[in-house]
Regions:
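Conserved nucleotide-binding/hydrolysis micro-motifs of P-loop NTPases
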Residues: 42-44, 116-118, 168-171
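Walker A/P-loop NTP-binding active-site region of P-loop NTPases
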Residues: 1-19
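P-loop/Walker A phosphate-binding loop and immediately adjacent motor/lid segment at beta-alpha junctions
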Residues: 51-52, 56-57, 67-73, 123-162
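Inter-motif core of Ras-like GTPase G domains
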Residues: 70, 98-116
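A mobile, often basic/glycine-rich helix-loop segment
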Residues: 59-65, 108-124
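Cytosolic-facing regulatory segments adjacent to core modules
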Residues: 14-31, 36-89, 95
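Helical "lid/switch" subdomain of P-loop NTPase nucleotide-binding domains
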Residues: 91, 95-98, 102, 122
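C-terminal lobe/tail of nucleotide-utilizing enzymes
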Residues: 144-232
Length: 232
């Protein structure tokens, strides 16, 4: 019994059931006693359209007021049930309503990159989209209808931690091969010249002194790792 995956956990909110959202029964990771996994579910995508409508119209449709705050509520309830300190969400590479909600109700976010054309383009896309998401979230958190919901929309405080560059070939000396290094430099430039200024204007950056303290200012990634499987 009990809730076994993220979709079933959200069902009371999205299917208007007369019951509250309950914590998910997480799977424990072998050899990692302090790590738990919330099982996903392909059916979560079925809620994408409904959530998108709710996030656009929740100010005028009371019947949808419980949806925008329900995902963060579920994660908080699940974390509290296991005395969890940190919740990490691995998001799909899309700009849909679920990702909009997940990112804007999180405390911090990292942007994973691969040294290729698509990540360069994605940097520009994020610079355009994330400020719009922030504007939506600012509006959502000020709506009385969402504040008074069963699952209130949380205070928005999302901040950018940095980028992680991965999936590239190494040459001798453990540095990226020249072809990959070209893309890496282009990504860094895009982050420095386009993404960071856009996030700064949207109040989505930490104080600059923090980035400098950890040597990740000026578009530098938090981590470069050719292949994460090599850490196992």
């Amino acid at each position: 019994g009990g809730v076994r995956n993220i979709r079933d956990g959200l069902a009371p909110a999205f299917e208007s059931r007369p019951s509250l959202v309950q914590p998910v029964q997480c799977e424990q990771i072998n050899g990692q006693p302090n790590m738990y996994l919330i099982p996903g579910h392909i059916g979560l995508a079925e809620y994408e359209v409904t959530l998108g409508i709710a996030q656009e119209l929740s100010g005028s449709l009371v019947t949808l007021q419980n949806l925008p705050g329900s995902i963060r509520y579920l994660l908080d309830q699940t974390a509290n049930s296991l005395d969890i300190d940190y919740v990490l969400v691995d998001m799909s590479p899309s700009l849909g309503a679920i990702n909009q909600n997940l990112l804007m109700t999180s405390d911090y976010f990292l942007v994973p990159m691969a040294p290729d054309y698509f990540s360069v383009m994605a940097t520009d896309s994020l610079a355009n989209v994330l400020p719009k998401w922030r504007n939506w979230a600012n509006s959502a958190q000020s709506m009385q209808v969402l504040k008074s919901a069963t699952y209130p929309f949380p205070e928005v405080k999302t901040k950018f931690l940095g980028t992680v560059i991965q999936k590239y070939r190494l040459r001798e000396g453990n540095s990226a091969s020249s072809a990959f290094q070209t893309w890496i430099e282009e990504i860094k430039q895009g982050v420095r010249k386009r993404l960071i200024p856009a996030l700064k204007d949207a109040n989505m950056l930490l104080p600059e002194s923090i980035y400098k303290e950890f040597d990740v200012d000026d578009g530098k990634p938090i981590l470069q790792m050719s292949e994460f499987n090599g850490l196992i």
